[in-house]
Amino acid sequence: MANRSYIYLKNGDEARILTEGIYTIPYFWQLFWDEEDLKAPIALWETAEELEEDEEQAERFYQEQNVDILLPIEKFRQSALQNRSFLEENVPQALKLYDAFVRYILANVKDGDVLGFDLLDVVFMDQVSVVADKLLKNIRAIRENQPKDLDFSLTDENLIGLAMGFPDYYASELLLEDNILDSDAYQDELKKMNPQEDKKVLDMTESDSKGNKPRVLLVFWILLALGMMWVLYIIFS
């Protein structure tokens, strides 16, 4: 199973996934943060890293602590607008998708929502200290408009996978307003994707999101057949 990161709208115990990164932390997300937003999560990631060899302690830790980055919606709105100029100057071809993505998030906000980022699986692909340094370096590079200092490339054409993240398979059911799947920006970028390599990634997101649906259908048909056999047995016995 792939290491994934998620951006989602959180309201109490409810989480509505917007998009997911596969083996990466999409760079649009990083335009929404500042150093203060990462301070507490990084400390928790470091603690989690120390507990990884003790499954019992690690499980208890995850039950007691939320290790995700959580942003108030208004702060997200301000950061998204403020850092848009970074894209406008350095990667203008990404603006159409970025604007559609921000609009998609804001259109689906409910009262009491916060914007969450679950990065732990991707963070743990390396040492926490290494990943934390890269994220903080990226935040500074964006703030100071120094694209050469970024830890990711702005020239890669796969904006869906590397910049926005892949939309959740069930997004159309959970997040109905300004659905990113229906936007011209998303459809335009989808056409640019490598039809072979990127289809594999899309298939991974779809199959994981579908979960055990084929298995459930198989059980349903087996039970239906057994039920019909039982009815026939009663009728003809």
Regions picked out by a protein language model, each given a short descriptive name:
Residues 39-90:
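Low-complexity, serine/threonine/proline-enriched polar segments
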